[in-house]
């Protein structure tokens, strides 16, 4: 049905946040303080305290006592840090208890300092174009007293630390996958279904604990396994892995990535996408590479 001039578009205003947290006593208060100072407040904030042994729970409880929209859920999982699976398992535990009447679902890390107008700006983007599925800013890290861009990904990619999804898009892609590479496959599937992913360079988020600071060697293998699960194939894995290793200034990491890729292939690791999606992803990746070569 064609819309008439008298019809008004319903504005998206309700954004709900889930924050997985494990031993984040040094940062969680900064993150929550930045949320309660937003020009547009969250509809709901769920902090999932995942087996913390420090004062994370106590700090969050101080906020829940003061702000009714902040809630705490305590869960128990294995103590070691595993990129991807552990954090998304915690996120999904939080997602289970959110008010389903949200417009935008947000996954945040517990070590961020977010600018006061961040979510007002995010909502503006969503309301300007109904085809926008995801919006995010950029991570900045402290280096010698200066906040510089944490340049680990292309500028059209939203970091896993701060993902915001339109509700019907989140549901269409089947939610988040508890697997390393979840923060890449989500965007690729959005594009597969014809949605747009938007990054806003005016939004600078302070990332208080740089990415990968607490990963062990097995995480490097998991990165390679993630490339396989994304359906990249060997050549795209080689190129993407080399690029990531060089950005991390650890060129030997590519060897671990490739080992993880081949182990996943040999073991028959289940992919995160079906064959049609895999074909789309490979074509998309190759086309992006060709664009960069052409300049």
Predicted regions and their residues:
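Active-site nucleotide-sugar/metal-binding loop of Leloir-type enzymes
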Residues: 88-104
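N-proximal low-complexity "stem/linker" segments adjacent to membrane-targeting elements
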Residues: 1-37
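Short beta-strand-to-loop acidic/aromatic patch adjacent to the donor-nucleotide binding site
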Residues: 101-113
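Acidic donor-binding segment of Leloir-type glycosyltransferases
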Residues: 32-79
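Conserved donor NDP-sugar-binding/catalytic core segment of glycosyltransferases
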Residues: 79, 113-149
